[in-house]
Curated annotation (Swiss-Prot):
Transmembrane segment boundaries: 4-22
Pfam families (UniProt xref): EzrA
Coiled coil: 22-43, 127-147, 194-214, 248-298, 326-374, 400-437, 478-529
Keyword list, A-Z: Cell cycle, Cell division, Cell membrane, Coiled coil, Membrane, Septation, Transmembrane, Transmembrane helix
Xref: NCBIfam families: PRK04778.1-2
Parts of the chain on the Extracellular side: 1-3
Gene from which this protein is expressed: ezrA
Domain of life: Bacteria
Functional note: Negative regulator of FtsZ ring formation; modulates the frequency and position of FtsZ ring formation. Inhibits FtsZ ring formation at polar sites. Interacts either with FtsZ or with one of its binding partners to promote depolymerization.
InterPro entries xref list: EzrA
Gene Ontology CC entries for this record: plasma membrane; septin ring
Name the UniProt record assigns to this protein: Septation ring formation regulator EzrA
Species of the source: Listeria monocytogenes serotype 4b (strain F2365)
Length: 571
């Protein structure tokens, strides 16, 4: 019982202690919120409202002021009283240990303070801006009016430079003057915000007018003086070149100058209407067009120099190429008596001849047009360049064809010499075979030998034809050379096989008496060697038989043969 009482007392003390701590914590937060409320109460909203109220307010400014005052009335009559009630509720809940309810109330107070502070910031900010606006308007209106007066003076002193745009500028200034009067009226009435907007608009408009007044004189100078003078100079240069014999009808200058005058009139209207960007673009484009016409005239002058420098040389080139073409025609006639000239080759000559005739005709027409002054020198220059390029191509093609004709005789002589050389090569090969003292020649080789003779006969027969077809000769010549190469390779292979067979059999004889199988196979190899002259087959049989008895023996025999070592010396 005693211990239970002690435990109960401890629990009571703990609860009371915890309640005290929580209560103290809530009072601390409530005090902080109360201090924040007091600070908000101390903000000088009423003072600022009083300052602005002393100003004479109308229109937009008055409406704004009334909205700010209404907002403050709401804070005074509703928001602050509501705040006081919730503060009292938080204190009561804390006293009664209703900490959860107290926490909710404290949170509501914080939100209410945020709303009040934000609303007061808006009121004070607006009032401050209004007061500053009134002061700033006064300063800027003085500066704006001074700038306006300066613009007025400049129009009076420099108005003659503005030409037909002067009435438009004066109208703009009159409109600005009315705006400034409206500003004064609104200021007197107390509508400072709307007056502020007018000042800003007037300042921007004056900047635009000032920039226009800077640009207009130079644009008018361009349209009234510079561009017309440029066109006059262009026409004078054009007419001077026509008097000197230039053909310039392709430029259609009268039509183009009329068009450019219309462009100038359009640019003047743009300037008068103060569409200055478009006017400046038009001026730049027209200068570029005039420059292009000058470039054309300059090109014609350069082309005239080119034509005078190159007309006679081109005429000389034509005459020389005509002479070359005529000589080539005679050469073709002579060659055709001896050689067959293919139609394709003749077509090449005929094509170049037609090109040459066309170039000659173009040159004659050009010469006539230059003499009559009916062609622009630039066009004449282009035609001369085309003719010169055509002559270069024609010359190269005809030189190539002439070289091919000259090579016919050279190729014929080489073919005849080579046919004789191939006959001598066969005789030499036959003698070499005889020195080898072969048992005989196989049918395959004899057939190749016979075919080789027929190939040379065909070549020699072709060389006796009239007219001589060198393409056919070249074909027979190539076949004969291929046959000779093949025959020579076969002969060398056959003689090589004969020597190797003899060496292999001679080496194998050391086993012949002791090995019947080897002896029988060697007899078979010798039959092929001496009877049907199949030397390659004889070698294969002898090598196979020897390798059965002594592996690697053939390599030793082959090495000894290549080194010219006697078979008897092979170990």
């Amino acid at each position: 019982m005693y211990y239970m009482l002690i435990g109960f007392i401890i629990v009571v003390i703990a609860v009371i202690g915890a309640g005290y701590i929580l209560k103290r914590k809530h009072y601390q937060r409530i005090n902080e919120l109360e201090e924040k409320k007091i600070k908000l109460r101390e903000r000088p909203v009423i003072d600022e409202l009083s300052k602005v109220k002393k100003l004479k307010l109308t229109g937009q400014t008055e409406a704004l002021f009334e909205s700010w005052r209404s907002s403050w009335d709401e804070i005074e009559t509703r928001l602050f009283p509501d705040l006081e009630e919730v503060l009292l509720e938080a204190e009561m809940n804390t006293d009664r240990y209703k900490f959860r309810s107290a926490t909710h109330a404290e949170n509501d107070i914080e939100q209410m303070l945020v709303v009040i502070e934000k609303q007061m910031d808006q009121i004070l900010g607006g009032l401050k801006e209004l007061l500053i606006s009134e002061e700033k308007n006064a300063k800027e209106s003085r500066a704006t009016k001074e700038k306006f007066a300066e613009l007025r003076r400049e129009v009076l002193t420099r108005g003659f430079k503005l030409g037909e745009t002067l009435p438009y500028i004066e109208t703009k200034l009159s409109e600005l003057s009315e705006s400034l009067n409206s500003y004064d009226s609104l200021t007197d009435q107390g509508d400072h915000l709307e007056a502020r907007e007018i000042v800003i608009v007037v300042q921007k408009e004056m900047q635009v007018i000032e920039a226009q007044m800077e640009r207009i004189p130079s644009l008018l100078h361009e349209t009234d003086t510079i561009l017309p003078e440029e066109m006059t100079k262009l026409r004078a240069g054009y007419e001077e070149m026509v008097r000197k014999g230039y053909y310039l009808a392709q430029m259609e200058l009268d039509k183009e100058i009329s068009r450019m005058k219309n462009q100038i009139d359009k640019m003047k209207k743009n300037v008068i209407n103060l569409d200055l960007d478009e006017a400046e673009q038009g001026v730049e484009e027209l200068h570029n067009e005039i420059d292009l016409f000058y470039d054309t005239l300059e090109h014609e002058a350069e082309a005239r120099h080119f034509v005078k420098e190159n007309h006679s040389p081109t005429s000389d080139k034509l005459q020389r190429q005509n002479a070359v073409s005529d000589a080539l025609a005679e050469q073709i006639t002579e060659v055709k008596q001896t050689y067959h000239v293919a139609e394709d080759d003749l077509a090449v000559y005929l094509k170049t001849s037609a090109k040459l005739s066309e170039a000659k005709e173009n040159f004659e027409q050009l010469t006539a047009l230059i003499a009559s002054g009916e062609i622009a020198y630039s066009a004449a220059q282009d035609t001369l360049k085309e003719i010169d390029a055509a002559l270069i191509t024609i010359s190269a093609e005809q030189d190539k064809f002439a070289e091919e004709l000259r090579s016919l005789r050279k190729d014929e002589l080489e073919a005849r010499d080579d046919a004789e050389r191939m006959r001598r090569a066969i005789i030499t090969l036959d003698r070499k075979m005889e020195r080898e003292r072969l048992p005989g020649l196989p049918e395959e080789y004899l057939s190749l030998r016979e075919h080789m003779g027929e190939s040379i006969n065909a070549l020699e027969k072709r060389l006796e034809e009239k007219p001589l077809n060198m393409k056919a000769v070249s074909q027979d010549w190539r076949i004969a050379e291929e046959d000779l190469t093949h025959l020579t390779e076969k002969a060398e292979e056959m003689m090589e096989n004969v020597r190797l067979v003899e060496h292999v059999i001679q080496y194998a004889n050391r086993y012949r008496l002791r090995n019947k199988e080897l002896a029988d196979e060697l007899v078979q190899a010798e039959n092929h060697f001496y009877n049907d002259y199949q030397y390659k087959k004889a070698l294969e049989i002898a090598v196979t038989a020897l390798e059965k008895v002594e592996t690697g023996a053939f390599k030793k025999v082959e090495k000894a043969y290549e080194s010219k070592v006697s078979v008897d010396d092979i170990e």
